[in-house]
């Protein structure tokens, strides 16, 4: 296990943002079910990408890893061998997409994955697939891994919960591929930008659908065309670097490169929100330029950029006014319960933060170095790293291996911008800073 030891730091300079995980995984999946050869440049290298590649190879896709791109020849006949076992690793997208994909086949397919996936909900997607005729059997408790899917689904109509956008994204993929027609309505749609990203891919690859309000219809039997695509930078990952730059004491700007302002990624909206709150952020060509600046807090609807909750919580600790992050129910079902995880860890640093109904209440307060835990969640680990860079005293963050999920070179990127972050194995020990209780007694919070 790895740990980060972080000293107070200011950053500036220029850095390339890692490729988008959301685009990478969708591109690999769609190239693998296309009839022909596609090329994906600048794909993210991560455990989730590898889980998607391995699952797609079981479909019969031929995937070659070249020096700067993936060359993928899709399976000519969409099928799986009998009794196939798909291991989704820790990837929510692989988990949901292949659960839905398995339902289009007559062969039984078993879906399994890491212990972390056990806490990721799947029941709403399963209910929708059952309404189309799929059946499920479980090794343990219902709606938990591992389970076996038996199809094929047949034409019809269903509803699917919108609490997590991946349910609708997975269903859209299955309904496009299976023999239709199909239609479904998203009930109480959340995380809308991420479902829109899936629809963007369907449109780019000539996979037809129609929309009426929150109801989507698919003719079925549609395979994507082949394509050549360059994955742009990940706005979700860029948010951590942008936050570090905003809080920096440096008078010099930080350039975040490979970010296209026309990209369909949902977390791009976070940057526009920060601008409205007063942050000095500008888009220029394919870069985002960030200057150290003050910004206000506010009442912030988290649904459009739910993955940004941990780093926004950190930023709100340094805002000029209190903040209420609301409509964040989806953050409870990610790699960790992010509402609880970020609260527990920032409180160790002295933050005045508390959970409220599906959200957070945060009063600005100074932060102090502490010993913290990532909760095995990449976004918690990176958010705490930014907090630690702007705290008084050194901090240590345990179990940071998870950061490789989306930002494999996170430490290298920070240190290239003059941060003071060291990566160590877990035998490193250090005296933690004062506990939150001590800080409360001293009147800091």
Swiss-Prot record:
One Pfam annotation reads EPSP_synthase
Mind naming one GO cellular-component term on file for this protein? cytoplasm
* Pathway assignment: Metabolic intermediate biosynthesis; chorismate biosynthesis; chorismate from D-erythrose 4-phosphate and phosphoenolpyruvate: step 6/7
Q: Which PROSITE patterns match?
A: EPSP_SYNTHASE_2
The residues listed in the UniProt record as binding phosphoenolpyruvate, with positions renumbered to this chain, are 21, 92, 120, 166, 338, 379, 405
Q: Which residues form a coiled coil?
A: none
Q: Which domain of life is it from?
A: Bacteria
Q: Does the keyword Transferase apply?
A: yes
Q: What is its EC number?
A: 2.5.1.19
Write down the InterPro entries for this protein, in alphabetical order. Answer: Enolpyruvate_Tfrase_dom (IPR001986), Enolpyruvate_Tfrase_sf (IPR036968), EPSP_synthase (IPR006264), EPSP_synthase_CS (IPR023193), RNA3'P_cycl/enolpyr_Trfase_a/b (IPR013792)
**Enzymatic reactions:** 3-phosphoshikimate + phosphoenolpyruvate = 5-O-(1-carboxyvinyl)-3-phosphoshikimate + phosphate
Q: What does this protein do?
A: Catalyzes the transfer of the enolpyruvyl moiety of phosphoenolpyruvate (PEP) to the 5-hydroxyl of shikimate-3-phosphate (S3P) to produce enolpyruvyl shikimate-3-phosphate and inorganic phosphate.
Family to which this protein belongs? Belongs to the EPSP synthase family.
Q: How does it assemble?
A: Monomer.
**Which protein are we looking at?**
3-phosphoshikimate 1-carboxyvinyltransferase
């Amino acid at each position: 296990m790895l740990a980060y030891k972080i000293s107070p730091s200011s950053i500036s300079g220029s850095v390339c943002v890692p490729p988008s995980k959301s685009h990478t995984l969708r591109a690999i999946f769609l190239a693998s079910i296309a009839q022909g050869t596609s090329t994906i440049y600048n794909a993210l290298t991560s455990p989730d990408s590898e889980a998607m590649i391995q699952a797609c190879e079981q479909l019969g896709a031929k995937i070659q890893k070249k020096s700067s791109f993936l060359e993928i020849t899709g399976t000519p006949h969409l099928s799986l061998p009998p009794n196939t076992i798909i291991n989704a690793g820790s990837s929510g997208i692989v988990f949901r997409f292949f659960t839905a994909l398995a339902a289009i086949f007559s062969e039984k397919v078993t879906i399994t994955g890491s212990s972390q996936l056990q806490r990721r909900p799947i029941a709403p997607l399963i209910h929708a697939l059952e309404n189309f005729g799929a059946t499920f059997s479980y090794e343990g408790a219902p709606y938990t891994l591992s389970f076996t899917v038996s199809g094929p689904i047949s034409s019809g109509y269903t509803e699917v919960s919108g609490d997590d956008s991946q349910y609708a994204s997975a269903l859209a993929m299955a309904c496009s591929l299976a023999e239709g027609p199909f239609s479904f309505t998203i009930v109480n749609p959340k995380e809308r930008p991420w479902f829109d990203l899936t629809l963007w891919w369907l449109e780019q690859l000539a996979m037809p659908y129609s929309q009426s309000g929150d109801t989507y219809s698919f003719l079925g039997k549609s395979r994507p065309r082949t394509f050549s695509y360059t994955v742009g930078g990940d706005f979700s990952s860029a948010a951590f670097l942008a936050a570090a730059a905003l809080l920096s004491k440096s008078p010099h700007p930080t350039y975040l490169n490979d970010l296209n302002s026309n990209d369909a990624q949902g977390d791009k909206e976070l940057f526009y929100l920060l601008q409205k709150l007063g942050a000095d952020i500008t888009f220029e060509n394919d870069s985002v330029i960030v200057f150290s600046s003050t910004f206000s807090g506010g009442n912030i609807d988290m649904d459009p950029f739910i993955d940004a909750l941990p780093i926004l919580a950190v930023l709100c600790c340094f805002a000029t006014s209190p903040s209420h992050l609301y409509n964040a129910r989806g953050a409870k079902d990610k790699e960790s319960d992010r509402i609880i995880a970020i609260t527990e860890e920032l409180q160790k640093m002295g933050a005045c933060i508390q959970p409220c109904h599906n959200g957070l209440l945060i009063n600005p307060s100074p932060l102090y170095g502490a010993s913290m835990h990532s909760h095995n969640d990449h976004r918690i680990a990176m958010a705490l790293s930014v907090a630690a860079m702007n705290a008084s005293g050194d901090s240590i963050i345990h179990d940071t291996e998870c950061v490789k999920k989306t930002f494999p070179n996170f430490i290298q990127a920070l240190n290239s911008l003059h941060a003071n972050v060291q990566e160590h194995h877990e035998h490193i020990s250090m005296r933690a800073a004062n506990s939150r209780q001590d800080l409360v007694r001293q009147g800091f919070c």
